[in-house]
From Swiss-Prot:
HAMAP family assigned: Pro_tRNA_synth_type1
UniProt-listed NCBIfam families: PRK09194.1, proS_fam_II
Biological process annotations from GO: prolyl-tRNA aminoacylation
The protein's name in its UniProt record: Proline--tRNA ligase
Family of the protein in this entry: Belongs to the class-II aminoacyl-tRNA synthetase family. ProS type 1 subfamily.
Localization, UniProt: Cytoplasm
GO molecular function terms noted in the UniProt entry: aminoacyl-tRNA deacylase activity; ATP binding; catalytic activity, acting on a protein; proline-tRNA ligase activity; transferase activity
Stated role: Catalyzes the attachment of proline to tRNA(Pro) in a two-step reaction: proline is first activated by ATP to form Pro-AMP and then transferred to the acceptor end of tRNA(Pro). As ProRS can inadvertently accommodate and process non-cognate amino acids such as alanine and cysteine, to avoid such errors it has two additional distinct editing activities against alanine. One activity is designated as 'pretransfer' editing and involves the tRNA(Pro)-independent hydrolysis of activated Ala-AMP.
Organism listed in the record: Geobacillus kaustophilus (strain HTA426)
The reaction(s) this protein catalyses: tRNA(Pro) + L-proline + ATP = L-prolyl-tRNA(Pro) + AMP + diphosphate
Source taxonomy: Bacteria, Bacillati, Bacillota, Bacilli, Bacillales
Amino acid sequence: MRQSQAFIPTLREVPADAEVKSHQLLLRAGFIRQSASGVYTFLPLGQRVLQKVEAIIREEMNRIGAMELFMPALQPAELWQQSGRWYSYGPELMRLKDRHERDFALGPTHEEMITAIVRDEVKTYKRLPLVLYQIQTKFRDEKRPRFGLLRGREFMMKDAYSFHTSKESLDETYNNMYEAYANIFRRCGLNFRAVIADSGAIGGKDTHEFMVLSDIGEDTIAYSDASDYAANIEMAPVVATYEKSDEPPAELKKVATPGQKTIAEVASHLQISPERCIKSLLFNVDGRYVLVLVRGDHEANEVKVKNVLDATVVELATPEETERVMNAPIGSLGPIGVSEDVTVIADHAVAAITNGVCGANEEGYHYIGVNPGRDFAVSQYADLRFVKEGDPSPDGKGTIRFARGIEVGHVFKLGTKYSEAMNAVYLDENGQTQTMIMGCYGIGVSRLVAAIAEQFADEHGLVWPASVAPFHIHLLTANAKSDEQRALAEEWYEKLGQAGFEVLYDDRPERAGVKFADSDLIGIPLRVTVGKRAGEGVVEVKVRKTGETFDVPVSELVDTARRLLQS
């Protein structure tokens, strides 16, 4: 492609609303443009990268026997009503009505649609297992789109679905898909970890997320410093043990704590450590109220609360709800004397507290000398807190450390969640009706482009891995007015293309400095500069990743380029 004829609108300044490196550079280098909040146009360079990523995904999906199809983004509400998610999915589901007042959704995912298709077409065990996938536009009405392609309202996704007659068959496909995902991310050059995860609104039990390591990641990964263990922080179990003090129980007393609302403030006021405090948080759990207790230096984990209570929706109560239910403000809550309508559950660490401190359900007052069991009842003790750095690793090897990650892939064992709800059944070998067992597997394709850009960039611009780069070689002349340089560049533009390389030829009448700056910004793996030694048949090759430069005779250019791109 000749750059003089290409649409590559680069920017010299960083856009004011671009917060993270990938967003800034993809805008500046002319790969994307924002069309609305959370909605982006892929310009020609961005589209080429997107197509490279999609090609890798297709190769790995086809290798494990998955078959590609294409489903509509516009989905009838009836399908979502059959699964129950029309009511439970929340405001992220984009809903609309047609001119006949019929309800539709713009799909954030396609479990309902694919289940209905397979339900209507597959009637016998002889057609199973079946693995289908698509690469499709998805929609999610994010409350706060941010970080460019990393959290948008319209995005590209690869979603695959598998249907089985047995859990063993599902396990085999799940493992195949897991390995295919690892291959995809390795081929994209990424530094990633597969972590144990929560299934969220999709449902199901066993699930893993694939996280690209990045300081701007919205997810925290808890990993062992001595093994391969890794989990999303929401799912990492706490295996720490707590020893109860042999200190004799003290008298329960109510004391004034005027203006002290946080654990840190109360602990400082009473001259105790936060570990002696009991933090009380009121949650609305599927319409009922639950008071969750954790130690003062710990944080309550809503995902664990949801899983322990087998709940669908868990939300922290609003200040208004808290006042109405507890007759006290948030900063003064405690488990002593609560209404029978409020269930009290506690983290295991709370059981070991002796002579602790908790809110008195009265503004400006706390109890001291608090002892669980004696002073208040707990309906259930469970692991309800987030793991902390330094906690023992759940696999018994080493201790927990934290890293940040960008989720780019997720694999689920759905079981019969959707097939039961939507009556996706088949006849087995004995003619008996059985429910299909399902798995689903997603990759955020446009998010993956941003994650690659986030990991592969420097102070000058993007540094694309060869596998996904928009072009292999950026060819340019140092002196646009030199007939000798232009003639050699034209000759090798043709020859490199004939040798199978994808070449962007900067034939613009610009100064060398402008061309070099744009080349570094765009980030093509190799830059070939036809300069002062053109008359000798020698060009300069620069490796974008390392900055290394080589003077190469044009007779060796093809072999040199192949070697450098493969290294």
